[in-house]
Amino acid sequence: MSDINATRLPVWIGCSPCVGDDCIALLTRGEG
């Protein structure tokens, strides 16, 4: 995972805990 994503993940999860899983799934798909 790139540094940019590593920095954004905590922010998205902190702002939208319920959508955290969706964001991670989208990021993993983009990275993969």
From Swiss-Prot:
Residues 1-10, 18-32 form a propeptide. GO terms for molecular function: toxin activity. Belongs to the MSDIN fungal toxin family. The keyword Protease does not apply. There is a cross-link at V11-P17 (Cyclopeptide (Val-Pro)). InterPro entries: Amanitin/phalloidin. It comes from the Eukaryota. This is MSDIN-like toxin proprotein 2. The keyword Metal-binding does not apply. Probable toxin that belongs to the MSDIN-like toxin family responsible for a large number of food poisoning cases and deaths. Processed by the macrocyclase-peptidase enzyme POPB to yield a toxic cyclic heptapeptide. POPB first removes 10 residues from the N-terminus. Conformational trapping of the remaining peptide forces the enzyme to release this intermediate rather than proceed to macrocyclization. The enzyme rebinds the remaining peptide in a different conformation and catalyzes macrocyclization of the N-terminal 7 residues. It comes from Amanita fuliginea. Keywords: Toxin.
